[in-house]
Amino acid sequence: MIYLDNAATSFPKPPQVLRAVAGVMMQPFGNPGRGGHKAALRAGRVTDACREAVAELLGGVPERVIFTLNCTDALNMAIRGLLHRGDHVLVTHDAHNAVMRPLAGLEQRGEITLSVLRANENGLIAPEAISEAVQPGTALCVLTHASNVTGTVQPVRALIAAAHGFGIPVLLDAAQSAGTLDLKDTGADMIAMPGHKGLLGPMGTGILYVGENVSPRPLREGGTGSASESVHQPDILPDRYESGTLQLPAIAGLLQGARFVRTHGAAIHEYETYLIDKLRSRLSAIPEVTVYGDGEAPRVGVLSFNLQGRECAEIADLLDRRGFCLRGGLHCAPCMHRWLGTQGTVRASVGPFSTEAEIDSLGDAIAQIVQVR
Ligand SMILES: Cc1ncc(COP(=O)(O)O)c(C=O)c1O
């Protein structure tokens, strides 16, 4: 099996991630923050170390690293925790439904209004798009760092600076960039990311980084193991946002994944871009194939394509039968497909352990599928 769906979740994970998950299941680890016995303290050291490793990747402070279930959970915490009735929100054409659905739900209930920022023909957003769309009640700007459909990377530092020029806080969806692109000094007020994609941790992990200038309302309240004399949710971080037992085995794996990308992240990005550019050149040479996204724009290891006159689901299915795991469809990004003018695409997304031979075989398989109708 050739796995090329790393944008959905990464596979394989580094061996130390697997060992860490198993280690927590096989030895006595207690509930982190609950109890003063050795097993609970040992568990607390794992969560502390993971917060530190992630904070280092972000150039942030550990207590502002909030563990979530996935990136969707982190985005919901930020969006629904921060917005108030009457707010106006800026969003982008490349937003995933993890951003769009919470926003569209609030809009449908009449609580907020939304504007989509204008993008250039290459899919990039310029800082002027923010000044054009801003309104007196604009309370949040949600940016997607890298598209999960085309892999195009937005100039987020310039966009965040532009939003801050109007006093607007920014939530950055780093689902497709965390682990490969540098997330230090982006200026984002909140960063949402999965632990199970580029950070190479297990499914069931995500992070919301909450910066100093924002304080979303917690969506989940309950026991934190701290301030137990009070029936009210504590204000201290990260406890304010982390009620209930954490997913310790998965967090132990995420710690190892975060350490791995801390050492290799830049090289991983270079390698993944090399592989995806190789695939782009191969596919671009086949007249029946349309490849989407600007090959010159900054990018991550994600590429979408279609075959003339064929449904993307059919192509993904034919590839699956040949042993390739690629995703066909809308990739939960309907606005992006409206912008591209597509009904869906086939998506290949590489990881640090993908190989050139796999990319060559995929190119061969697509060339064969084009021949056979
Ligand atoms: C850009 C983007 N945002 C958010 C998400 C949601 O991530 P998760 O599956 O961890 O909830 C994804 C998932 O593919 C994504 O690509």
Where are these regions (language model features)?
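Pyridoxal 5′-phosphate
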Residues: 1-373
